[in-house]
């Protein structure tokens, strides 16, 4: 089932026309140098940035959804967002709870997400008192809450712009696990990323961008090749297999 379809999607001078489709249950990574257009593409897919061409989500044009209906289908984490000062974490999370879910189910899901992201003891804390990494995890918990399958059966898509920023190793592993759980429930996630080895291990498919163009797209093993990556990033890469797993390294490593 094709969950998301793009036909000649473009944004003025920032994003060249791009067409593709995304099946349910997949994790797609956007990679490319800074300024490649990854954030522009994600904001367009979220319906927050006007674009040319056509975007369809769950078989319906994105432009035809009302704000509340779109919020029920997809959640979007932007790259940067300032913390609201006079609000505790639990109140901030409540802003993202989907309509129609029971309070008990919402409380259970908040507890589950906060435990996984190690936020349980932060629930009463003011947002202004959080570190950068804590605030990032709160933002992640919020967008997961918005579309978590247990409390939002209509959810389809999670759009994350550099979600691993500010996370330590254990927190990155926790996020990986939540994303796999989300996608295994028939949803899809599209994520902008910078760690090429992480993309190599976690992504089902990859969109490789540079200068506002999607230069390569397809399965991870098709796109994550040394010659393709070297040309785009202007770094000499090679791929080595260690313990039956491929790793991307630079040639002068």
Curated annotation (Swiss-Prot):
It is a peripheral membrane protein. This is Vitamin B12 import ATP-binding protein BtuD. ATP binds at residues 32-39. The keyword Endoplasmic reticulum does not apply. InterPro entries: AAA+_ATPase, ABC_transporter-like_ATP-bd, ABC_transporter-like_CS, ABC_transptr_BtuD, Metal_Ion_Import_ABC, P-loop_NTPase. Its EC number is 7.6.2.8. The gene is btuD. It is found in: Cell inner membrane.
